[in-house]
Amino acid sequence: MRNQLILAAAAVPSLRVADVEYNTEQIIRLIAENSRCGLIVFPELSVTGYTCADLFGSELLLKKAQEAMFIIAKTTEEYRELTVIIGVPIRFENNLYNCAAVISAGKVCALIPKQYIPNYSEFYEGRWFASGRGIVGQTIRLHGHEIPFGTDILAEDPESGAVLGAEICEDLWVPDKPSTHMSIAGANIIVNLSASDELIGKQEYRKELVA
């Protein structure tokens, strides 16, 4: 890191299920309100909402989500010292992935897919999403842009020089956490995009996972 301090924000926008336009407006508003930060992290699937269920099979929803990602990226052109990470569903090679999109200086810099897909209790993500495990060194072409796609990606914050890693919700709850490998690879900051429900004692347990 060039600087030893980076101001980070965990943003919690008001969201509507499958209302991409509304969700995008809320994300852009929070970016503008917190533009003095060096890093803003939004929840898992924040562009569409987590609970779209079988609507994740809608090509229209996925198309709108992609368009929204680039609209959000465009708004960051004026905040060139800021990195934003949002959650978005992305189709890659005929599979759908729950991704973290790393955005900075008007560009989508990377797409990092969720590796561990929960299928127990109230979670049944495997109905819609594939695991990103094993996807390394790939790129995806979206809207005329070649974007790095995979689980081996670390991004550098343009202002602080911090090396950023991203994982998504369940990735933190497994024994072989992606964040462990990111740390070994040199990540200074690791973010976890989540849309997890609240249960008694869950917050304390979550803290223990990262202690």
Q: Can you annotate each of these PLM segments?
A:
Residues 1-211:
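Enzyme catalytic cores with a strong preference for nitrogen-chemistry domains
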